[in-house]
Swiss-Prot record:
Transmembrane segments: none annotated. This is Type III pantothenate kinase. GO terms for biological process: coenzyme A biosynthetic process. Catalyzes the phosphorylation of pantothenate (Pan), the first step in CoA biosynthesis. It comes from Clostridium botulinum (strain Alaska E43 / Type E3). Pathway: Cofactor biosynthesis; coenzyme A biosynthesis; CoA from (R)-pantothenate: step 1/5.
Length: 257
């Protein structure tokens, strides 16, 4: 049984993989001041709720974009499972060629997604990860990670409008029926959601132009808001909610088995 840990800015996603299938996955809040004891309690409770024995965990791999939680997280994993986790970072075997000016700058989440997309789809891909930040990454058919771009996430954009404009309320992220709206809440939703969809479509268009090698890139979306955006645009070919966990599983096999 392999434990997969994806620590993002907002949530930590955990998955348990055994016998070529996922048997459980959970999402807990990322909190910078949480101790290793608190993380230990949470993960042991989650395992117990699913009738999983911690002693059956034979390997662990961690991807994190939150440096200030890593000390507590690693201590928790060592204490609960008695083994050293693989940490996604410089020196790890990926099977892709990172063409960034400084490969060490590429976030662990982007590497994990790129590895998964390359190994699973075997074609040029554009990966959009709708998280706290929205990242766009391009990978060629030969496994060259070309780079991409990073944008404020959808919730960050909406929250910034609420925080900086005194008379505008915080709104739910729901797609309105029309672009031309007749009340403040729907008008904000229209501007934020349709504006974001337009951003996605334009960035995908420009990335395809720059990647042009005769093969149309396949556009994959993942992350918590992927379905919301994908339902409103033809720019996204597929939503793969498990892309990051798949990437962690692949990286574990490359580096431990």
């Amino acid at each position: 049984m392999i434990l997969l840990v994806d620590a993002g800015n907002t949530n930590i996603v955990l998955g348990v993989y055994k016998d070529k299938k996922y048997i459980a996955s959970w999402r807990i809040s990322t909190e910078g001041n949480k101790t290793s004891d608190e993380y230990s309690i949470q993960i042991m409770q989650l395992l117990n709720l699913n009738n999983l024995n911690p002693e059956d965990v034979k390997g662990i791999i961690v991807s994190s974009v939150v440096p200030n939680i890593m000390h507590s997280l690693e201590n928790m994993l060592r204490r609960c499972f008695g083994q050293e986790p693989i940490i996604v970072g410089p020196g790890i075997k990926t099977g892709i060629n990172i063409k960034y000016d400084n490969p060490k700058e590429v976030g662990a989440d982007r590497i994990v997604n790129a590895v998964a997309a390359f190994e699973i789809y075997k074609r040029p891909v554009i990966i959009i990860d709708f998280g706290t930040a929205t990242t766009f990454c391009s990978v060629t058919e030969n496994g060259d990670y070309l780079g991409g771009c990073i944008c404020p996430g959808l919730r960050i954009s909406a929250d910034a409008l609420f925080e900086k404009a005194a008379k505008l309320p915080r709104v739910e992220l729901e797609v309105p029926r029309k672009v031309i709206c007749k009340n403040t809440v729907s008008s904000i939703q229209s501007g934020v959601l349709f504006g974001y969809i337009g951003q996605v479509e334009y960035i995908v268009k420009k990335m395809k132009e720059e990647m042009n090698d005769g093969i149309e890139p396949y556009v994959i979306a993942t992350g918590g808001l992927a379905n919301l955006i994908a339902n409103e645009t033809d720019a996204i070919d597929k939503v793969d909610s498990d892309l990051t966990l798949e990437g962690l599983k692949i990286l574990y096999k490359k580096n431990r088995e």
